[in-house]
UniProtKB/Swiss-Prot annotation:
Gene encoding the protein: metG
Protein's job: Is required not only for elongation of protein synthesis but also for the initiation of all mRNA translation through initiator tRNA(fMet) aminoacylation.
Organism: Streptococcus pneumoniae serotype 4 (strain ATCC BAA-334 / TIGR4)
Protein's recorded name: Methionine--tRNA ligase
Subunit structure: Homodimer.
InterPro entries with a match to the protein in the record: Anticodon_Met, Met-tRNA-synth_bsu_C, Met-tRNA_synth, Met-tRNA_synth_2, Methionyl/Leucyl_tRNA_Synth, MetRS_core, NA-bd_OB-fold, Rossmann-like_a/b/a_fold
Length: 665
């Protein structure tokens, strides 16, 4: 298996805000490839993670009144929860604040400094905090000038404002490696997918002459300090790019994964906006370290809206959580992979999203499965007849289309062309639906002399749907399993040597099939998605006049002296369990910072069926509530605060960095 080691990475995401479907696309796309390669017999290592250093993170933390570490800790929890929701099968989640990564970054910096690939100089230029990138005046999308014509600022290509920065900095000698990089590109034209982007890098960035790259900063502290000059922190691109190597154990005692997977096939997938850093800075950094370069760099386009890029101010941002909660996971995975052509941007519209669910998933695939299961139950008491080739005049055509679809699917998957891979699957689905119309099994069933033909039709239908279920497994795992379950077949374990004729004997379908994709009301669901998108738009604030505010209260007003009697503290959940004899109560053991753990009973069991998810959370409690006896044998020493809205209840938690026992007031 050593020759079939495969390493796939997402970019590490910058945790400065909530991730939308653009980031979800990249992560799902890598997940699809990882799952496909596993099913093709590869030993796969799939990496994703977060780029947690930098000035923007430091500023966000200061705005929130917490430490940068506490800020990124909280963001990491949210990102991991999103990847769990999207069923991402990553093998490791790296954070650039991980100790092992920071140590290697510092070591590499000093090594490059010692071999004169890094030198100390001074940088002056326009800098975008949001992009973590420097720009020349000619690179700015818009330039601001004063009345005398002097440049006073500008806008980066990303749309973010820039500021003038002048500071001492270390530089990476990119110029020294320019010729070697050009030679590598010429020898490996397949290095960047899609075709054309490699020439774009040569034409726009390399041929005009590579400038040495600033790789340290002194104006903020949230980063990896340079050991020999700690007033400098290592700037984003050395720190961030090295994650692909450090995650596998590069320059560490435990380096088995690096030896194994870096010497296998290495694929990086990134958005087109960060292609330059991955196609120029990263290869040169690896050349400096005398490390093999990756095999493929896949730079995909963006999901845009009818009115341009996603923007909260436009009210057109789409978050994956909303789509999954409303329509399930598989429609989202299918839509994103089907709708972004290689080398181009894709457009998201609510109309197209709902339409693809109804027409391609519910009609094409769902109805095919329902009709097949229903007919096998009706004509053969649920027993799928043995597969026999060529009984009807249409069997050969279906078999040929199936074999061609399988071959095309593999070709497009190897090229990471997901829209065409799925198109190959839907070609088979369409042909199978047509096969039903051509063979007319309801007519065959009326003539006992045509029983063999009817049996062949049923077995060919089941065999074709089985092939479809196998091919969609990397994209839509739940759907694949649901289809195979209704056919009475086992889950997919391999895509190698898949064939229509390779159908198991003695298989019984379920007694009654269920729709795998219920049809949606187009008008209602389109309106729902638009409403959710509009809800993501920041509210326009009107001028606030406190004298005009009318307070809306559920209870009578109290005096400040009354409220001041209540002591609210931060407490950490140490243990939680269901209370025997009650379907409402949970029993908590909490550390409220006063030296001894306390017990509180709370009637929230129905809102937290998996109560263990609360362990480790920091909650707010009323600490000086008089203890009371409950269920005859328990004493509850306080109250845990929660919020209720629309029948849903959520415990009020605080940032993990806040110490136990902290008083809230």
């Amino acid at each position: 298996m050593s020759e079939k080691n495969f390493y796939i990475t997402t970019p590490i995401y910058y945790p400065s805000g909530k991730l939308h479907i653009g980031s979800a696309y990249t992560t799902i796309a890598c997940d699809v490839l990882a799952r496909y390669k596993r099913l093709m017999g590869y030993d796969v290592f799939y990496l994703t993670g977060l780029d947690e250093h930098g000035q923007k993170i430091q500023q966000k933390a200061e705005e929130a009144g917490i430490t940068p570490q506490a800020y990124v800790d909280g963001m990491a929890v949210g990102v991991k929860e999103l990847w769990q929701l999207l069923d991402i099968s990553y093998d490791k989640f790296i954070r650039t604040t991980d100790d092992y990564h920071e140590k290697v970054v510092a070591q590499v910096f000093e090594r490059l400094l010692a071999q004169d690939d890094i030198y100390l100089g001074e940088y002056s230029g326009w800098y975008s905090v949001s992009d973590e990138e420097f720009f020349t005046e000619s690179q700015l999308a818009e330039v601001f000038r004063d009345e005398a014509g002097n440049v006073t600022g500008g806008i980066a290509p990303s749309g973010h404002e820039v500021e003038w920065v002048s500071e001492e900095s270390y530089f990476l000698r990119l110029s020294k490696y320019q010729d070697r990089l050009v030679e590598f590109f010429k020898a490996h034209p397949e290095f960047i997918t899609p075709d054309g982007r490699l020439n774009e890098m040569l034409r726009n960035f390399i041929e005009p002459g590579l400038e040495d790259l600033a790789v340290s900063r002194t104006t903020f502290t949230w980063g990896v300090p340079v050991p020999s000059n700690p007033k400098h922190v290592v700037y984003v691109w050395i720190d961030a790019l090295l994650n692909y190597a450090t995650a596998l154990g590069y320059a560490q005692d435990e380096h088995g994964n690096f030896d194994k997977f870096w010497n296998g096939t290495v694929f990086h997938m990134v958005g087109k906006d960060i292609l330059r850093f991955h196609s120029i800075y990263w290869p040169i950094l690896l050349m400096m370290l005398d490390v093999k370069l990756p095999d493929r760099l896949i730079a995909h386009g963006w999901f845009v809206m009818k009115d341009g890029k996603m923007s909260k101010s436009k009210g057109n941002v789409v978050y994956p959580e909303m789509l999954v909660e409303r329509y399930g996971l598989d429609p989202l995975r299918y839509y994103l992979m089907r709708n972004l052509p290689v080398g181009s941007d894709g457009t998201f519209t609510p109309e197209d999203y709902v339409g693809r669910i109804n027409y391609e998933l519910a009609n094409d695939l769902g109805n095919l499965l329902n009709r097949t299961v229903s007919m096998i139950n009706k004509y053969f008491d649920g027993q799928i007849p043995a597969y026999v080739e060529g009984v009807t005049e249409f069997d050969h055509v279906l078999a040929e289309v199936a074999e061609q679809s399988i071959a095309d699917f593999h070709t497009h998957m190897e090229a990471v062309d997901y829209p065409r891979a799925l198109e190959a699957v839907w070609t088979l689905i369409s042909r199978t639906n047509k096969y039903i119309d051509e063979t007319a099994p309801w007519v065959l069933a009326k003539d006992e002399a045509l029983r063999d033909q009817l049996a062949s039709v049923m077995s060919h239908l089941a065999a074709s749907i089985r092939v479809v279920a196998h091919l969609i497994e990397p994209f839509m795992m739940e759907t694949s399993r649901a289809v195979l379950t209704q056919l009475g077949l086992e889950e997919v374990s391999s895509l190698e040597n898949l064939s229509l004729a390779d159908f198991p004997a003695d298989v019984t379908v379920v007694a009654k099939g269920t729709p795998i994709f219920p049809r949606l009301n187009m008008e209602e669901e389109i309106a729902y998605i638009k409403e959710q998108m509009e809800g993501n738009k920041p509210a326009v604030e009107k001028e606030w006049n406190p004298d005009e505010v009318e307070l809306k209260l559920n209870k009578d007003e109290i005096k400040f002296e009354d409220f001041d009697k209540v002591e609210i503290r931060v407490a950490e959940v140490k243990e939680v369990s269901k209370v025997e004899g009650s379907d409402k109560l949970l029993q908590f053991r909490l550390d409220a910072g006063d030296g001894e753990d306390r017990q509180i009973l709370s009637g929230i069991a129905k809102y937290y069926p998996n109560e263990q998810e609360l362990v480790g959370k920091k909650v707010q409690i009323v600490a000086n509530l008089k203890p009371r006896k409950m269920m005859k044998k328990y004493v509850s020493q306080g109250m845990i605060l929660s919020a209720e809205h629309d029948g849903k209840l959520t415990l009020l938690t605080v940032d993990p960095a806040v110490p136990n026992g902290s008083v809230i007031g």
